[in-house]
From Swiss-Prot:
Pfam families: Adeno_52K. Cleaved at different sites by the viral protease during virion maturation. This is Packaging protein 3. Residues 1-55, 381-415 are annotated as: Disordered. It comes from Human adenovirus C serotype 5. Involved in viral genome packaging through its interaction with packaging proteins 1 and 2. After proteolytic cleavage by adenovirus protease, L1 52/55k protein is removed from the capsid during viral maturation. Residues 381-394 have a biased composition (Low complexity). Belongs to the adenoviridae packaging protein 3 family. Residues 400-415 have a biased composition (Acidic residues). Induction: Expressed in the early phase and late phase of the viral replicative cycle. Transmembrane segments: none annotated. It is found in: Host nucleus.
Length: 415
């Protein structure tokens, strides 16, 4: 039944209640004009009677409308949009990756065979074929029905396409991460220091200062245990691969300064591809290596390259440069009126003196330090030729040091 017609029917619970009331109710004689009115009156007196038009309006109010108007639906299965979605939904295709799914459960080289089979079947598969009942009858020669062969071929093609899409996404993600890291200046500086450090450690593996620095560097890599172990054993044979990787990345990122950013990303990808092929052939002792194993080794080197670049970014932040912080004028304390008048008086008194003495008033906050005037020193008994010292230098000529808590009284002629 169409969902629009299905929602016109009363809910199942109400239908059951109506059927129970009808079965429990005693059979009545054939309705007459007076009898129909009497039965309606009796039903109304019992409280079970509801006019058909009102009952239909009640059912329609529950399931008609949009959004919140449908909250009165008895169950999610009877919700109109849920029914439409269920009737028109497409078949769910689970995600598959022939290279990485079901680790350790596939026979050797079976992933490689499935991948190449899906690639070859992709061109000859009829995607619009509709299976009929006669297609499920087994063939007399092969014992396999055409429908079974078509479904198996479709599964291989689907697995191949999904595997290719996932590997494309992985490669795009790697390129974006490498491009972002290589574009940072800190990565080049940190990679240069890291390469210099591992080269010095390789020449002098028993140096205690270098080993102490190694432990400090290892503290920056806390996510990947394989990378930490290789970094701790970088001078040993089992950590030689990491030393080669650092040398390759250093030659691309640090040495080749004339390369563009896109060329550096391409060079790093080519290096990962070459390293993956080399070590895959070294493992299998043959030029032929299953493509799934080669892809896994390349993926391992890609992750390790990202670890090296991220570590270089962390190390490049530590620079021996002096940081100058610009302090805004608004963050300084405002001069009070008393300090402003003192500074003005000192500036006026210093007019005509040497430039060096005039500049010293405003250097390093000198304008905020009070010093007694020449007239005050003469009145106190000090000689006119006595140099005026700052208040922090102690008492000068028997005059006590000025305290900020003391109230300032202007002298004669001062305003």
């Amino acid at each position: 039944m169409h969902p629009v017609l299905r929602q016109m029917r009363p809910p199942p619970q109400q239908r059951q209640e109506q059927e129970q009331r009808q079965t429990c109710r005693a059979p009545s004689p054939p309705p007459t004009a007076s009898g129909g009115a009497t039965s309606a009156v009796d039903a109304a007196a019992d409280g079970d009677y509801e006019p058909p038009r009102r009952r239909a309006r009640h059912y329609l109010d529950l399931e008609e409308g949009e959004g919140l108007a449908r909250l009165g639906a008895p169950s999610p299965e009877r919700y109109p949009r849920v029914q439409l979605k269920r009737d028109t939904r497409e078949a769910y295709v689970p995600r598959q990756n022939l290279f990485r799914d079901r680790e350790g459960e596939e026979p050797e080289e079976m992933r490689d065979r499935k991948f190449h089979a899906g690639r070859e079947l992709r061109h000859g598969l009829n995607r619009e074929r509709l299976l009929r009942e006669e297609d499920f009858e087994p063939d007399a020669r092969t014992g396999i029905s055409p429908a079974r062969a078509h479904v198996a071929a479709a599964d291989l093609v689907t697995a191949y396409e999904q595997t290719v899409n996932q590997e494309i996404n992985f490669q795009k993600s790697f390129n974006n991460h490498v491009r972002t890291l290589v574009a940072r200046e800190e990565v080049a500086i940190g990679l240069m220091h890291l390469w210099d450090f591992v080269s010095a450690l390789e020449q002098n593996p028993n140096s205690k200062p270098l080993m102490a620095q190694l432990f400090l560097i290892v503290q920056h890599s806390r996510d990947n245990e394989a990378f930490r172990d290789a970094l701790l054993n970088i001078v040993e044979p089992e950590g030689r691969w990491l030393l080669d990787l650092i040398n390759i990345l250093q030659s691309i990122v640090v040495q080749e300064r004339s390369l563009s950013l896109a060329d550096k990303v391409a060079a790093i990808n080519y290096s990962m591809l070459s390293l993956g092929k080399f070590y895959a052939r070294k493992i299998y002792h043959t030029p032929y290596v299953p493509i799934d194993k080669e892809v896994k080794i390349e993926g391992f080197y890609m992750r390790m390259a990202l670890k090296v670049l991220t570590l270089s970014d962390d190390l490049g932040v530590y620079r021996n440069e002096r940081i100058h912080k610009a302090v805004s004028v608004s963050r300084r304390r405002e001069l009070s009126d008393r300090e402003l008048m003192h500074s003005l008086q000192r500036a006026l008194a210093g007019t005509g003196s040497g430039d060096r003495e005039a500049e010293s008033y405003f250097d390093a906050g000198a304008d905020l330090r009070w010093a007694p005037s020449r007239r005050a020193l003469e009145a106190a008994g000090a000689g006119p030729g006595l140099a005026v010292a700052p208040a922090r230098a102690g008492n000068v000529g028997g005059v006590e040091e000025y305290d900020e808590d003391d109230e300032y009284e202007p002298e004669d002629g001062e305003y």
